[in-house]
Amino acid sequence: MSLFSSITVEEFNRERTVQLADDHFELQRPGRNHEWIVRNVLPIGYERYCAVSLPWEAASDGESHLFFGFREAYHFFKRPVPDPLTLSRWHGDFKFVEANREIPPALKGILSRSAESADLVLVRCCRSSDPMDCYYWTTERALFFELTDPFWEMPHRFGHFDIFPRGAAWYMAHRDDEPLLYLAGTARLLDSIHTALPDQALPLRLDDRFF
């Protein structure tokens, strides 16, 4: 039995009380060679944005090495850490694959507390650019944050995901081929994330690249 219950697109959109940019992919379909940026995917109107790394692997001399943070890999390979370190720079400096999608416990705690008045978390999974290939679910907020890897428990595990609690206190986006969670929220929330995960969170602006 699935831990996620199906809902309609109308029910999902009714709860998604957010503002989308004019060039958000739902309002303006990007061309094939479009370089995606944060506002193409995440809602605008939140105070701050960031990317949080999930476990990822980089190869060197035929061996694969597991990392959790961004700077950690520079130190391991004895490379200077860029200043400033940006998501685009990290993405260009390493060839990597996603190791797993276990959400850091500290992040789960912060997100759960910031939405403690919400009873549900809502999820959209789009497996392709076809709107008919999008699926919508809800699950209990407390249950969602008990799961080590909530994506593994979803009816469809792969695709592009939009996730938010009822009331949209924060907003999360994730692609299954990138070891990243993109987050939008209040300044206080993002400050808490950067404090708890100093090497796993990088600040973003709306016009930064979305990978």
Regions found by a protein language model. Name each.
Residues 1-211:
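Acidic, proline/glycine-rich low-complexity IDRs
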